[in-house]
Amino acid sequence: MTSLTQVKQYGLYVNGEWETTAEKMEVLNKYTQQPAAEISVATKDDVNKAVASAKDALKNTFSPYERYEVLMKAADLLLSRQEEFAEILATEVGKSIRESRGEVERAATTLQISAEEAKRIHGEGVPVESAPGSENRMAFTVKVPVGVVAAITPFNVPINLVCHKLGPALAAGNSVVLKPAEVTPICALKLAELMEEAGLPKGRLQVLTGDGAEIGEWLLENQDVNMFTFTGSPRVGELIRSKAGLRKVSLELGNNSATIVHKDADLEKAASLISQKSFNNAGQVCISVQRIYVHTNIYTAFVNKLKEKTEKLVVGNPMDEQTDIGPMIRLKEAERVEEWVKEAVEEGAKIELGGKRDGAFYLPTILTNVNDDMKVCRQEVFGPAVAIAQYDEIDEVISKVNDSDYGLQAGLFTNDLQFAMKAAREIEVGGLIVNDASAYRVDHMPYGGVKKSGNGKEGPKYAIEEMTEERIIVLNL
């Protein structure tokens, strides 16, 4: 085993060098709640130095093929160290070792996709001669890097979501200043070591650790940052957008994902997928199923089937192979979910399963008899709790799904093609998943939301569009 059993110290990664600072911060093992690592806390000078280094690196040629080679080598190195990274993930996040292995594999895939996309960045010919007075002119567009990209990543998927920002940014020819979540920074720091080994040119990647609010503010103040890409809460996303000015901003924010189970659905399939995709990573995923709308005709049968599937999930030590669900990221988050569930019960909800907390663990919880004004339906739970409500009519359930501040993804189980197409047209989300839960995602698909779920798209091909500028060249011959 190579998991974090001793407190290891990590510095900042700036201009290709590792630097320690006077102030340190502990990273906890989320299962034992004991220190697993110690990280350096960046100062404003460190932030400005990192941005200057990233800007300076842009002066050096980094061809599309070189980007491809570096990213492919990094993916190979990551796969060769899958178990090491998986154990770090299980330690610093608390997700199960099996789920952690899957995340590392997906992160490598994200780097591979980014590498391939680096070779496909191109412009197009523009027929300017069709305009009067433009005879003997030719025009074409090229895609150029936006420049210095500040990437701020969340705690819940700390290797794959880092790769979703780092991979496309580098593939597009940018430099990156990465700020990982302070509670789960180790995978990002280890990834910097790996990128260096893969041959990434000096200065193309900086990793800053420490207080997110402070570092984020300093990055926003620095006008040499050309773009911000952020995954996290709507509150912080709105703050970044308000302070970024005319600079590019891409935001992947919250959601209270809905999944519909229609009367013609395959109940076995629906219950199995929803159980899995409601409680993975203790429900701490932006597209985890939170609201479930079930047709009245099959409501009781579905609730029983979902309880049956969920009861089989094993809660425990993330390092145990049998474990499905580990602790939440912080004790206070488990306490918050506990409070929201208690509040729902006081307002009339019924606990069908779970509803209990043990330290930072919160048992997978199924609530019925809910209404759309309860916090567990209206806000983002970001924990292992789902709320099930009934519906009778298609228009009614579409209206319920849309009655939300969020719009990232939704799920729909049905064999009715007309319903599926109506939902595709009318449900206000960035992605509708038919015959799977809202939490379905593969890493090359476009991923992003509407309303308070953010703007812009992830998925390497689509993120590269966000991270480049289109420039037109006109030749007067």
Curated annotation (Swiss-Prot):
It holds the Pfam family Aldedh. One of its GO terms (molecular function) is lactaldehyde dehydrogenase (NAD+) activity. It catalyses: (2S)-3-sulfolactaldehyde + NAD(+) + H2O = (2S)-3-sulfolactate + NADH + 2 H(+). Keywords: Carbohydrate metabolism, NAD, Oxidoreductase. Its EC number is 1.2.1.97. Induction: Induced by growth on sulfoquinovose. The active site is at residues 252, 286. NAD(+) binds at residues 232-233, 253, 380. SUPFAM superfamilies: ALDH-like (SSF53720). Part of the sulfo-TAL (or sulfo-SFT) pathway, a D-sulfoquinovose degradation pathway that produces sulfolactate (SL). Catalyzes the oxidation of 3-sulfolactaldehyde (SLA) to sulfolactate (SL). Belongs to the aldehyde dehydrogenase family. This is 3-sulfolactaldehyde dehydrogenase. It comes from Priestia aryabhattai. The lineage of its organism: Bacteria, Bacillati, Bacillota, Bacilli, Bacillales. The gene is sftD.
